[in-house]
Design a protein with these regions (language model features):
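Secreted, periplasmic, or luminal enzymes acting at the cell surface/secretory milieu
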Residues: 2-3, 7-86, 92-94, 149-153, ...
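Short, conserved secondary-structure segments in the cores of folded domains
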Residues: 61, 109-111, 139
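Surface-exposed loops/turns
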Residues: 67, 117, 144-145
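Intrinsic-disorder/low-complexity, polar/charged segments enriched in Ser/Thr/Lys/Arg/Asp/Glu/Gln
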Residues: 70-72, 120-124, 159-161
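Short, hydrophobic/aromatic beta-strand segments
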Residues: 84-91, 103, 135-136
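Intrinsically disordered, low-complexity Pro/Gly/Ser/Thr-rich segments with frequent PxxP/GP/PP motifs
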Residues: 99-135
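Terminal connector regions
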Residues: 128-167
Length: 167
């Protein structure tokens, strides 16, 4: 059978289930603008710099937490260019299954750092149940148990991932 690839295309949207790949499905569900792509030109959080940065070693200090606990997500950012520069490290979280449809990505934190050429820095984000809350069908502000995906990167499109479970 044929295989279908579904990708996240915009920041903070809900998953439509529509494929982005070329072919018959793409022609059926593509935008009506024939002179531009479906992909946005710049992803949310995109920025320019006079230097380059790399992200590595995304890790969580725990693989699960309770609604009373917290966990820490860390990433190592390295200035791989020849100039000193600033970078905004962004934290996104995705609730994989919820009682109401959840966005494919939500910006939950960011930190601006300055690195000299060749310098590395470990950046940490504290993830609490408060960051996972949303309004359910009854308009209660709740966090529900389940699987979550943590994404850390330089924009909504360029991220490194880790996962945890809320018990």
């Amino acid at each position: 059978g044929s295989e279908m690839c579904i990708r996240d295309r915009f920041y903070n949207h809900k998953n439509t289930g529509r494929p982005l790949a070329d072919g018959a499905w793409f022609q059926k569900f593509r935008s009506n603008y024939i002179d531009i792509d479906n992909e946005p030109l710049y992803p949310f959080g995109f920025g320019l710099s006079y230097t380059t940065f790399s992200y590595s070693d995304v890790a969580l200090d725990k693989t699960s937490m309770t609604d009373k606990g917290e966990l820490t997500a860390t990433v190592t950012v390295t200035n791989t260019g020849k100039r000193d520069g600033a970078e905004v490290v962004q934290l996104y979280i995705r609730d994989l299954v919820g009682s109401v449809t959840r966005p494919v990505k939500e910006l939950k934190g960011f930190e601006k750092i300055f690195l000299k050429a060749g310098e590395s820095k470990k950046v940490s984000f504290k993830i609490t149940p408060e960051l996972l809350k949303f309004y359910n069908y009854n308009l209660d502000f709740v966090c529900e148990p389940g699987d979550f995906e943590v994404m850390i990167g330089r924009s909504s499109r360029d991220v490194k991932k880790a996962a945890f479970k809320l018990l």
